[in-house]
Amino acid sequence: MNTRDTLDTQLNVLESFNPIVPEGFKDCKYLMLGNLMPSIQQKVLDQLPTRPKLVVLDTMNFWMDHFWDDLMIALKGVDVLTINDEEARQLSEEYSLVKAAQKIMTMGPKYLIIKKGEHGALLFHEDKVFSAPALPLAEVFDPTGAGDTFAGGFIGFLAKTDDISFENMKRAVIWGSAMASFTVEKFGTERIAELTTEEINLRLEEFKNLMSVDIQLV
């Protein structure tokens, strides 16, 4: 379930959608631009009188195929781009994810998150790389929405802690990964809707154990 085939995309109402940001949200410090047409994402950002502390953008291969120029404009105004490995290779025309990341970060984003499904995620910033594991699950019911959940967990943690250092972004990636690991366990938002704080903490502990190792240097 690490790849997908887009058989058909119908924009329907989104093709002429004009987003209006409510006054109460125009002073937000953290902005997540969901996976919509790049021109719509840009319209949201343009309505904010003061640039947020952090702007995160999600996109996909369809926008790269059909709205490349608009996407290039949108990327210039964001801090973090989150995409999967297939999309990173398409966007950069590089197979190596390290080379892809370096090329994509010249397009505007200061940070890049490359999601690799069951193989975890990579966080890039300048010459720094953080590799986050995925939690091995015995059963995956439905991966739909896992990427959105990841993004929500990621920026939600950063907004809560109000710290956008690289070290804290590493923690945010783990938070996003943990939340996404719940989403795939049931259909839609069913699993997320029933989560308890205890379950989240236990899942985060599982991720900590995956990354913990005591090794002796030669």
Q: Could you describe each region identified by the protein language model?
A:
Residues M32-M37, N84:
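Catalytic beta/alpha-barrel core
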